[in-house]
Amino acid sequence: MSKINKLEHIRNIGICAHIDAGKTTTTERILYYTGKSHKIGEVHEGGATMDWMEQEQERGITITSAATTCRWQDKIINIIDTPGHVDFTIEVERSLRVLDGAVAVLDGVAGVEPQSETVWRQADKYNVPRMCFVNKMDRMGADFYRCVEMLKDRLGAKPLVIQLPVGIEENFKGIIDLVKMKVVIWKDEALGAEYFEEDIPADMKDKAEEYHAKLLDMVVELDDHVMEKYLSGEEVTAEEIKRLISKGTISAAFYPVLCGSAFKNKGVQPLLDAVVDFLPSPTDIGIVKGMEVSTGEEKDFPISELEPFAALAFKIMNDPFVGSLTFIRIYSGKITSGTTVINTVKNKREKIGRMLLMHSNNREDVKEASAGDIVALAGLKDTTTGDTLSDIDQQVILEKMEFPEPVIELAVEPKSTADQEKMGLALSRLAAEDPSFRVSTDHETGQTVIKGMGELHLEIIIDRMRREFKVEANIGAPQVAYRETITKACEIDYTHKKQSGGAGQFARVKIIFEPLKDVKDLKDEDKIFVFESKIIGGAVPKEYIPGVEKGLNNIRETGVIAGYPMIDFKATLVDGAFHDVDSSVLAFEIAAKAAFREGMPKGNPKLLEPIMQVEVITPDEYMGDIIGDLNSRRGQIQSMDPRGNAQVVTANVPLAEMFGYVNTLRSLSQGRAQFSMIFSHYDQVPSQVADIIKAKK
């Protein structure tokens, strides 16, 4: 690849949206028009290039975010196609972490849907500049202006409309470019590859003028010189408008909104122009946060080829031909095949073997990669998602990624002894690929338990185990990942003493356990368990205090009510005692565990269950039955809103009550209603339900 691969020529973007908004189709069209794909792949025919796993082609949904490199004008665009199904939000989360910009695809009929909100919040968390593409403008009921309003109302976003649709529904034929003030019309017979510009027709002139004025009002605020020019009645040039749209997009002052129909091949080239004109290059982002290993100091590192090498591993994938592939985003410096780097999170050296540029599931070998690139490395031994690879002499750890807690679990058993060993290998490989998927062993039953983000998530894991690793397994019924917490503060003073000839063990700890105030948001890792030491005067020597924290952290995995992990509490070590000879880190670890066992029952412990935010879209006539059914599932209705000729019901419902809901909804609505759900928060289980759960344990 030639040296135009310079930082300002690169765009690392994600394409993210709600399931079925047409995201993969949009990506397919981008690959087609940038010359990467010689034939258009249709999702509903199971032929999309980006959806390369067998399950994806069967189900018509994108599960793993395939990374693809293509070119437009003189720019290189690295695209991560992310899944829109709620069970795969982890894929979205980790791709957003390494992107510089994103395109949010909205369904022109449905507008902002629950998963659109989730993705938007995730993009906010990583400060990803983005633009919106209102897709499916050719569909019955498509309403561009309503989508723009929903961006304001539902997401609190500040949309900047830079295009208007020409024609509605099946008569949609092009767009008005509000920067150039021209109409762009596509020729149907040329598969969208040919289009022409013309003057705005008289019947749309007023609307175009109105939106052009709104656009100018918003962008001139970013530049005093242009503002003066505008206010004094001088014309603001198209180049000035473009520069200011780019400036505002990168600073998240607003979000440009475009429209089109990817399926009907309209609006994709202007979307590509907008990606290269308005979304940031790595140099616009400028820095990446991290920690210098030698000093432990947090600092901002410049994104530059001239700096020492630093990259973040954001995805592991098993490729049937190459083996394990680790996708990395290089933030600074460069690497060549044969170089040795260090994984600073695990403190292990890794030798760089094959380096690949990926086009969906085709691959191109490269010998060198540098800052701004997204490449796949073959054969790394110890690197997992979220790890940093760094120059050996100047080591850094880049900002870590956070992964959500799983909310559902299943027991799996191999069907035969031959499957036993293969299953262990398969599950550990799949867990390395996907941090939101966990594997553990139930100590009481000896069963292997797999945990994930939803029924579909685990279904696909089991399917992959069968197809890719040829493992046959028996699957148990899904179980809810309950948690436990305390509701009042309690104090425990515990002494651990063991004397049996030779060296003994001695440790005394006095710990206050108290509930963390906000139980609601489990997404913030800090709220699960907080430990603090208030030891004064060396009652417990400094070197023993980590033993107390380690003991509590281990024991909290088995709560005191029904053995579920304990969360949302703080433990403060306030006093203690030690013995010069008999005390050790281990003795304090044992004392902390025993203090937990004795102290927690005094804190009025309660069971917590995951609550899901459920959104049901249904024709009017089934509303009553559907609401009645949600109420019977201990659901709390949050809102009911009309959307086109349908009703949207939003409710908070315990996950335990939602198993098999898809079949119930189908029969209640004769298959006409649809639903989606996302994890909302953990809440206390009502006492009569808690008794049943305890009895089952």
Swiss-Prot record:
Keywords tagged on the record: Cytoplasm, Elongation factor, GTP-binding, Nucleotide-binding, Protein biosynthesis
GO function term, MF aspect, one: translation elongation factor activity
Residues holding GTP: 17-24, 81-85, 135-138
GO cellular component assignments: cytoplasm
Main location: cytoplasm
CDD domains: EF-G (cd01886), EFG_III (cd16262), EFG_mtEFG1_IV (cd01434), EFG_mtEFG_C (cd03713), EFG_mtEFG_II (cd04088)
Pfam family, one: EFG_III
Biological process terms in GO annotation: ribosome disassembly
InterPro entries registered for this protein in UniProt: EF-G-like_DII, EFG_II, EFG_III, EFG_III/V, EFG_IV, EFG_V, EFG_V-like, G_TR_CS
Domain tr-type G residue range list: 8-283
Localization per record: Cytoplasm
NCBIfam families assigned: EF-G, PRK12740.1-5, small_GTP
Family assignment from sequence similarity: Belongs to the TRAFAC class translation factor GTPase superfamily. Classic translation factor GTPase family. EF-G/EF-2 subfamily.
Function description: Catalyzes the GTP-dependent ribosomal translocation step during translation elongation. During this step, the ribosome changes from the pre-translocational (PRE) to the post-translocational (POST) state as the newly formed A-site-bound peptidyl-tRNA and P-site-bound deacylated tRNA move to the P and E sites, respectively. Catalyzes the coordinated movement of the two tRNA molecules, the mRNA and conformational changes in the ribosome.
Official protein name in the record: Elongation factor G
Upper taxonomic lineage: Bacteria, Pseudomonadati, Pseudomonadota, Alphaproteobacteria, Rickettsiales
